[in-house]
Amino acid sequence: SGNPVAMAAGITTIDLICKKNFHINLEKKTKKLMVGLKNAANKYNIDLQINYSGGMFGFFFTKNKKVKNFKDVSNCNQILFEKFFKLMLKKGIYFAPSSYEAGFLSIKHSDKDINYTINCAENVFKSLKEN
């Protein structure tokens, strides 16, 4: 609509994402989070598959090696996803509430944020395995 505040925000956003290595750094952060979640799940023998690109990601509780489409997601353990989601939420970590939805990481998520999330996930996986 040409609102000056919206235009200024848009220009600033474009300036930020045009900075050298912006997308490379964003993907590195996402990879760190996804690999951390995968390793934490593996530690407790929980089947977790991950998909990610740039700052967008998804993870799925399944033994299948690839999750590529709606049918694949439908065959995942939705009950385990819901339990994981709720336990992570209690720890202050908000993921997308369904494995049918994508999650997003931003360039502003710090290594401290990512490490905290991975540590919380490891505790949740341990709890899920014990129960």
Each predicted region: which residue ranges?
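Conserved N-terminal phosphate-binding loop of PLP-dependent enzymes in the Aspartate aminotransferase
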Residues: S1-N131
